[in-house]
Structures are given as C-alpha cells and as structure tokens.
UniProtKB/Swiss-Prot annotation:
Belongs to the ABC transporter superfamily. Ribose importer (TC 3.A.1.2.1) family. One of its GO terms (cellular component) is plasma membrane. ATP binds at G38, E39, N40, G41, A42, G43, K44, S45. Keywords: ATP-binding, Cell inner membrane, Cell membrane, Membrane, Nucleotide-binding, Repeat, Sugar transport, Translocase, Transport. Its EC number is 7.5.2.7. This is Ribose import ATP-binding protein RbsA. Its main location: membrane. The lineage of its organism: Bacteria, Pseudomonadati, Pseudomonadota, Gammaproteobacteria, Vibrionales. InterPro entries: AAA+_ATPase (IPR003593), ABC_carbohydrate_import_ATPase (IPR050107), ABC_transporter-like_ATP-bd (IPR003439), ABC_transporter-like_CS (IPR017871), P-loop_NTPase (IPR027417). The keyword Membrane applies. PROSITE patterns: ABC_TRANSPORTER_1 (PS00211), ABC_TRANSPORTER_2 (PS50893), RBSA (PS51254). The complex is composed of an ATP-binding protein (RbsA), two transmembrane proteins (RbsC) and a solute-binding protein (RbsB). Part of the ABC transporter complex RbsABC involved in ribose import. Responsible for energy coupling to the transport system.
Amino acid sequence: MNQAILQLSEIEKAFPGVKALDKASLNVYPGRVMALMGENGAGKSTLMKVLTGIYSRDAGEIVYQGQPAQFKGPRDSQQAGISIIHQELNLIRELTIAENIFLGREITSAFGRIDWPQMYAEADKLLARLKVKHSSKTLLGQLSLGEQQMVEIAKALSFESKVIIMDEPTDALTDTETEALFSVIRELREQGCGIVYISHRLKEIFEICDDITVLRDGKFIGQCEVVQTDEDGLIEMMVGRKLEEQYPRIDVVHGQTCLEVIGLTGSGVHDVSFTLKRGEILGISGLMGAGRTELMKVIYGALPSERGVINLDNRTINPVSPQDGLANGIAYISEDRKGDGLVLGLSVKENMSLCALDKLSKGVQIQHQDEVVAVDDFIQLFNIKTPSREQIIGNLSGGNQQKVAIAKGLMTKPKVLILDEPTRGVDVGAKKEIYQLINKFKAEGMSIILVSSEMPEVLGMSDRILVMHEGRITGEFEAKHADQEKLMACAVGKKVSEEAA
C-alpha cells in the first residue's frame, strides 16, 4: 500500500457535556477508496469538520502530502485540494446548475466580466461525466433531489481535488445515478485521487471501497482492507455487539380499518385506493419519482387533492394543510428532516413539542412543566443522545435528529403515523432502535405507513405492501408473499397479481 496522502492521528475534540473525538485516526491513500464507518454519533462528521477547519482540534495531528496541516476553513482546505460533499445539500435553488457549481469563483474574461459561454461549457462537461441529462443553464430548483446531489458532486469534481470526502453521497440517488457515481469514483481512483466514502449502506462499501476505518464513540476502533472482513464483522466493529436480526418484525392482531383512501387523485397521484388497519404497518415501495411522497403529502394535507375520498375512523376528512392533517390525527415524518421536519436553530425540546403546543396548553398558556416531562420521556424512550433537552438540534447526529423528528410527530398523539424514509442516513445501530420503536407503536395499536426506497426494509418490517409507479398503485402484496423481484417488477410498471406471485 502506498504512503498515505492524508493522515489524521489521535484527533481529540470536546464540546460542552460531550467528548466527540477521543484519539480518532484516519489514513487516506492515493488511488484508493477509504470507507469511514460508525454509528451516528461515532464522530465521523466531527472528524471531517476538524479536517476541513470548521472545528479546531484540541489535540492530535493532521499531515497532508507529507507536511503538517491546519486548515482555517473549508475554502482553505478546498484550495489545498481537499473537497467535501456534505450529506445535506449546500446549493441555491434559484440559481442555475452552472452558477451553483462555480459560485464564488466564476469564470471571467480578460475584462473581468463573467464568461457565461465558457462557464456553461465547463459545467456541461462535468454533468456529462456524471451522465446528468440537463443543461447547466437549468435552474437547480427544477431538478429532483437525486439530480441536485449529482450537481453537488459535480461541484466537488470541478476543483480537481487530490482528496474527495463523500458523506452519504448516494442517499437520494436512484440506482442509475448511483452507478454513474461509482463509475466516476473508479475513474478518480485510477487518476490517483484519495477518496473518503462515508455511508451506512454496507452493500456499497463492499462494492466500491478498498479499505475501511471504523469509529465508535469518537474512538478509532480499527482499519482493514475490505477483503479482510464481511458484513457481520463490520457491524460488530461498528456497534460493539452482534445484531442478531436486522428487521425485528412482530406479529400483532390487526384491529378495525382506521384509514380508507378511495380514488385519490392530485399532485402526481392518480386514482389511488387502499385501506389501513389498527396495529398494521403498510409498506409503500417504488422507485424515485413514483409518487410515494406525493401520495403521503396529499393524505396529510401538504399537497392539494383534486378528487377522491379519505376516511379516518369512519369519518370523511379533507385536509387542506399540514395543520389540518395534524388536527385530524395524521402525523407525517418527512424524508427531508432538515428541510421539512426540524428547525435546526431551535433546541431538542422546542423541536419536539412544536406541533403539540395545543395539547400542552391551557387557554393561551403553555404548561412548561408538562412540556418538560413529555420531552424527557421521549428522550429516554428513544435513547436520544443529547447533553440536555436544551441542546440545539443542529448539533446532534443525523440518527438522533431523526429520532427527535419521529418523537415530534408522536407528541401530537396521532391515529395514523406516516414515516417517509425513516432510516435514511441512519446507521445500523440506530436503525435497529427505530425499528424497535415502530414495533412498540404497532403493538399499541397505532396505524403506520412506512415509505422506503430500501426494499429489504419494506419487506422486513411491513405487514402488507403497496408498490407505486408513475403515481399509481401497480401491486399489492401480503409481506409474506412478496420478494424483491416482485416489488421491482411492479415498480417499473408491470402488473403482478398476488395469486400469480
């Protein structure tokens, strides 16, 4: 193995009430892809922020290209040849793709004016390299979340970096977009670029990475080549224990029908009908753009419906806003927790109780003691890792933020809980905790809709599964009669009956 192009040795970083990094180490080698693994809260993101100068380090050493390094901020590290593609998009929807890629370093002519033809041409080359079928003159806001992620990757590629850090880069990508990204990673590897690949998708780690570094509780646990381990061994390194069963589904006797949707049409949804019983988990599967999220938002009131009927507990409802949906007993946990679900500048307590203030008030007065008790109960129940309920939620790991988002929905005491990609960007340990919580609500008789792009998750946790394609239901199965092949056939528009299956 070559000499490391980047070495982080025994890095330490503490925040009030928590030691985020405790002698964490990472080596990055030219022409190799290093997976950085660990549960949420293990210190992966903090280590990357120390590297790029967002946080100062308390102790430890960074060596880059054989020289000690201490970057003053992301721009400094970027100019030195280290780019980071963040899990959360750092783009401006109102600008074009090209303007986003070259923001702050626009290509100019000899007279100091922006050379638009040259800038668009360079941006188009980057998009073609990633197989993005859009002109760089397109406004970013017109792109899907997955396409926007590819623009973020194109932006990093434009720096011709020697080290590229990818934090959950495929989280919002389709299979086609993921394969295009992997092609680019292989190309960069051949060119001698060192890549840090942060992902919770173990299948991707074994497909694209050469080496693995594992952190746990801010500590360096170990480094090995991918060929020296397997999924079980890697999980045990990450969580410090064996995960006996990935999807701990429980059997519950279903009650009466709680939710009935008949001929629902609107906002990318066409003539959808289904029922949901008490104590049932209904999985919704399909490819990106199939209309799953749109269907949930129409039911919840976040998108308008054109026609159709929604019955909740034998009463017809017509939610015209999210507040209306909540008032009727429907809670929706968004796939975009930072865009739709949480206010990052507020505390854990404020976020959790935000939608339930009417239930925590008497008249116009909020009962703060009741609020504190309810929030503390959820922090304990959900095992949310936070120094206190007053901690700003933006400082928490992704998995703990997701737990707060789910608790926020449950604070409203809903009849129907809609979970849209509840484990996206969440490590295997936190996933298991979320699955156990879902089972707890199911056992208590709550009606749950689980929307997920991960077919094993839908198959493993659901009682019944609907598959969508182009806004329509193309398949319905009892989970015990379904498999990935049947779900995929329906997801691409092929009608598959359960009997034929």
